[in-house]
Amino acid sequence: MSETVTQTETDQRPATARSLGAEEKEAKSDEQFQQERTIKGFRWFIVIISILSSVTLYSLDNTIVADIQPQIINTFDELDKLPWLSVAFLVACVATNSIWSKIYSQLNAKWLYLFCVVLFEVGSAMCGAAPTINTLIGGRALAGLGGAGLYVGVMTLLSVNTSKRERPMYIGMTGLTWGVGTVLGPIVGGGFAVSKVGWRWSFYINRECRPSVQPIRPLTVPPVFFAAVAIPIYLFMLPSFDPRPGVSYKERLAQLDYLGTILMIGACVSGVMAINFGGQIYPWDSGQTISCFVVSGVLFIVFGLQQWYCIGTTKENRTFPCQFLARPAFIILFVQTASVATVFFVPIYFVPLFFQFTRNDSAIDAGVRLLPLVCFIVAAMILNGALMSKFGYYMPWYLVGGCLSLVGSVLMYTIKLGTSTANIYGYMIILGVGGGMYAQASFAVAQGKARPREIPVATGFISLAQLTGGTIALAIANSVFLEKASAGIMAVVPDASKETVQSAISGASSSFFQTLDPDVREAVLAAVTHAISQVYILPITGAAMSISLAIFMPREKLFVASDSGDRDGVTPLGAMG
């Protein structure tokens, strides 16, 4: 028996031999994940507010570009590169998410998180000062790279600084800050787009800047507060967490999966490019689109083989946490998270678009229209975190949330040009409550089910699902909308060129709609509304998937006290895989 145990332990060790003292220190690191929170009182309040505020900046950057694209096109006059503004950010987020989670499992979470915050701020500054659209795209990629690390860092810091029982509540709070940033993104972006100072200040507000221009002084005070107050708090009040005490940095860096990292980045970049550019820049059957799909598919296959056979790495240090694929619990949580990301990302982008086209809303007014959706998403997230911590059951949240999301998505699909605003708000509320009930739940469930040292990796695993689901859903939704809207408009106005129609849809040429006769304009808007309604097939599919998977989730308690629980007072883990 002892020989078997020894062999198993040997197989799981990295290639570099570790001393017994280092192993003992790593065992102590495992205990740090499980112990009660050490920061108390007002200090904890300040720390948690500072950590959560960075989620606001990250979510703000996700949605701020939507309403300033026409101004960016007018500045640089390069419509063909417009998709890159979102693609660069999304590619950097998706491609590096798993990598960041592995790095967080090796290096000090506090200092790595600070590095990601700085990286994100530098990317935002680059966007604001960009002399060319290529520089702007590069800044978006850098901001996405830092933002992905920042988001994984927030979840990691919350997991290592809270007890298991209170963790769902604090993770639920990320929904509040995410919602604030999501709502402010279109509003702030639209406000700067129509102001004298211009769209560049939409990116400057994500970094420390001097409020020297009087018209935007009120909007620059909060970012100055974040940069001037939050970073010193991170430095002096946030406790350090070293996941591998006693292990040299040379050994830690040697254990990163560099080959897997390169393969994953290449596969993600080519895949996201194919989905985003297909039907927009290039036809779906063009050589460019097909080549991107083929390259992505080949690289994903090679990446899968490299991870499975541990080529150039070990089972313990693989970029992708393949061990979770052997646990049904984590597979279900991954798909659930990707599905709910589809449910709320699609309406967040297309609700403002609907009101801009059909109600002639300004960018600011269209952003405000999101309030019913986002407010109820946030409220449901907070309620989920509080009640799931108290009662422990998590399966009902997925089942009921999926059902409400399905109802809300179907209702959004039925919206026509003449549908009243009150009805649309009601549909959004149903959708928001449903999606919010389980939007962030998987983070807490996965962290509760993971082994102590797997918590950063489990966080990255669920974050990857969220980003992947949202990225693919938005890419497909954009392609469907552009294709359906272009075809519908050209059927009504056959003399219009495809380039003119696509420019009008993107917002770069509003004069196209103004020159149409009233009857023709109404027919065109009806075609646009029909195109927008088609994108809600994706949330319908995502909600249906959530309901189907929820049926197979166990009826277990995960976060509440039990007589046989561990020393944290939570039920034993692993009942679901």
Swiss-Prot record:
Q: Which GO terms describe its molecular function?
A: transmembrane transporter activity
Q: Where is this region: Disordered?
A: 1-32
Q: Which domain of life is it from?
A: Eukaryota
- Asked whether the UniProt record includes Cytoplasm among its keywords, one would answer no
Kindly list the residue ranges recorded as spanning the membrane: 45-65, 84-104, 111-131, 141-161, 174-194, 218-238, 259-279, 292-312, 330-350, 363-383, 395-415, 426-446, 457-477, 532-552
Induction / repression = Expression is positively regulated by the pgm cluster-specific transcription factor pgmR.
The keyword Transmembrane is annotated on this UniProt entry: yes
What are its GO cellular component terms? plasma membrane
Q: Which Pfam families match?
A: MFS_1
> Bias category Basic and acidic residues: which stretches?
21-31
Q: In the UniProt record for this chain, what is stated about the effect of gene disruption?
A: Does not affect the production of the naphthoquinones derived pigments.
Where in the cell? Membrane
Give the bilayer topology.
Answer: Multi-pass membrane protein
What is known about what this protein does?
MFS-type transporter; part of the gene cluster that mediates the biosynthesis of pleosporalin A, ascomycone A, as well as a third cryptic naphthoquinone derived pigment, all responsible for the coloration of conidia. Seems not to be involved in pigment biosynthesis although its expression is regulated by the cluster-specific transcription factor pgmR.
Name listed for the protein in its UniProt record = MFS-type transporter pgmG
From what organism does this protein derive?
Answer: Aspergillus terreus (strain NIH 2624 / FGSC A1156)
Output the lineage of the source organism: Eukaryota, Fungi, Dikarya, Ascomycota, Pezizomycotina
